[in-house]
């Protein structure tokens, strides 16, 4: 017996974060590789390759490259949404610029990952001014690569 909803609602059942790069490992992308290959009930609705809190600052450049490579390789088969988390700190313009650069690298169509990325997690966005700065950065990443406005969220 079917059920007709009187409304439409979307929700996230689960999300999963993976460090974008780990130190002291033969393969710094090993945690991303594991997250990208989760399937069935083990797979989250949203996977967050985390290049912020979960990744050591000295590993973040490598983390961006790992995100690009792993998502390009496994993104088409991942059953949920993919939202990489970039660095972003509202009081620090230099950190916001690094976050923009991370988005630009991840969104590069020639790198092969962007077709599988649903958006970005931008941490520490607080007031309306923060939202505007984050939106401006996303728009810059889209524009730089000729992506349609709204491609990234």
Task: Describe each region flagged by the PLM.
Residues 2-153:
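Conserved alpha/beta-domain cores
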């Amino acid at each position: 017996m079917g059920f007709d909803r009187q409304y439409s609602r979307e929700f996230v059942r689960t999300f999963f974060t993976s460090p974008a790069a780990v130190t002291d490992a033969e393969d710094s992308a090993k945690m991303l590789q594991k997250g990208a290959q989760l399937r069935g009930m083990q797979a989250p609705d949203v996977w967050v390759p985390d290049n912020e809190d979960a990744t050591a600052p000295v590993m973040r450049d490598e983390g961006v490259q790992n995100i690009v490579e792993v998502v390009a390789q496994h993104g088409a088969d991942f059953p949920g949404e993919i939202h990489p988390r970039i660095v972003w700190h509202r009081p620090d313009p230099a950190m916001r610029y690094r976050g923009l650069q991370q988005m630009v690298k991840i969104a590069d169509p020639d790198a092969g990952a962007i077709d599988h990325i649903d958006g970005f997690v931008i941490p520490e966005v607080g007031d309306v001014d923060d939202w505007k700065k984050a939106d401006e950065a996303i728009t810059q990443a889209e524009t730089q690569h000729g992506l349609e406005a709204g491609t990234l969220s």
